[in-house]
Amino acid sequence: MNILLSNDDGYHAEGIQILARELRKFADVTIVAPDRNRSAASGSLTLVEPLRPRHLDDGDYCVNGTPADCVHLALNGFLSGRMDLVVSGINAGVNLGDDVIYSGTVAAALEGRHLGLPSIAVSLDGRRYYETAARVVCDLIPKLHTRLLNPREIININVPDIPYDQIKGIKVCRLGHRAASAEVIKQQDPRGESIYWIGPAALPEDDEEGTDFHAVNNGYVAITPIQVDMTSYNSMSALQDWLESE
């Protein structure tokens, strides 16, 4: 199996390096990842400056671009040979609920899906037990790849930040929902000019049983199939009726 591995935390991040090490025990893995942290880059592509992939001593690549850039570049002729699967992660921090809209980790997997490959995104609820998340992914890939992976959607995996033997199981979940984000943080730079920081993610608003939030918070691995079609089909008839009534 040939796996393209990317992320949004950057090539040197601990999560991607641990995952690469474990995946290479049963697959041929090529890393094409950003040269620095590009968290929350979503699916943005770099269109106004050239991409400069750098071939590293270990045979992998880092790119001066976004996670989606990396996957787009890798699968559109930059790499020789056919890839069978795109894996993105391990992200330092969960991508639950509304997080998937902003996540570069999820976006890298979505770009793989867009280019016709089955794709997986994996995130850890912390920064400690990357080995747990890596083991979960390595356990799941043979099962998902042979039977369930659909190139029209991705599998979003979130793993509790606990030892592997404390994982209670795996749950297939829907996305939950976060409350509106908190206000930005205002500070002053040394010159007295105002600067702003986007603060941490808001607390969950919908974390009831059956959501990805609930699963991870209760010690389960959360798996959510995600598709690109964001159409609100339930609203289409009502909207059409409203337009025709005017």
Swiss-Prot record:
One GO molecular-function entry: exopolyphosphatase activity
Known EC number: 3.1.3.5
Reactions performed catalytically: a ribonucleoside 5'-phosphate + H2O = a ribonucleoside + phosphate
Pfam families: SurE (PF01975)
Localization of this protein: Cytoplasm
Primary localization class, coarse: cytoplasm
Free-text remark on how the cofactor is bound: Binds 1 divalent metal cation per subunit.
Binding site for a divalent metal cation: D8, D9, S39, N91
Reported function: Nucleotidase that shows phosphatase activity on nucleoside 5'-monophosphates.
Family that this chain belongs to: Belongs to the SurE nucleotidase family.
NCBIfam families referenced in this protein's UniProt entry, alphabetically: PRK00346.1-3 (NF001489), PRK00346.1-4 (NF001490), surE (TIGR00087)
PANTHER family listed in its UniProt record: 5'-NUCLEOTIDASE SURE (PTHR30457), 5'_3'-NUCLEOTIDASE SURE (PTHR30457:SF12)
Protein name: 5'-nucleotidase SurE
Organism: Mannheimia succiniciproducens (strain KCTC 0769BP / MBEL55E)
Lineage of the organism: Bacteria, Pseudomonadati, Pseudomonadota, Gammaproteobacteria, Pasteurellales
